Amino acid sequence: MVVDDTDHVRTMLAEMLELDGFDVVARSASGDEAIAAVGGADPHVIVMDLKMPGIDGLETTRRIKEARPDQAVILYTAYLDATIEAAAREVGVTLCLGKIDGLPELERQISRLTLELAGDA
């Protein structure tokens, strides 16, 4: 599942992940959309942007984790620093990645988390 308020970023990220063999079960443009979609989509991993209008990625994660405590969430943001990483840990983000780390690193981490969730890691 990809959550990003910027249309072209959300589309590009989802399409690149799909081209590389990942099943993107949902795309959401806001935290509220993500919260509404997550139950029906049942994603293994959520790739979450931080800065979005309305509720941000941290609050969205907090609300999702209330209902789905084991949900894996990767915070994927251009605004990563130690303060944001600490806040992300507090709400249950599984992993923080800067967008500067690039798509290959994101894909490696999604693969790793998927294997861990399947019990194969």
Q: Where do the model's predicted regions map?
A:
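Two-component/phosphorelay signaling modules centered on CheY-like receiver
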Residues: 7-26
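Active-site beta3 strand of CheY-like receiver
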Residues: 41-47
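Conserved sequence signature across two-component system core domains
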Residues: 3-4, 28, 46
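Short amphipathic alpha-helix used as the core "switch/output" element in two-component signaling
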Residues: 58-69
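Alpha4 helix (beta4-alpha4-beta5 surface) of REC/receiver domains from two-component response regulators
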Residues: 59, 80-104, 108, 112
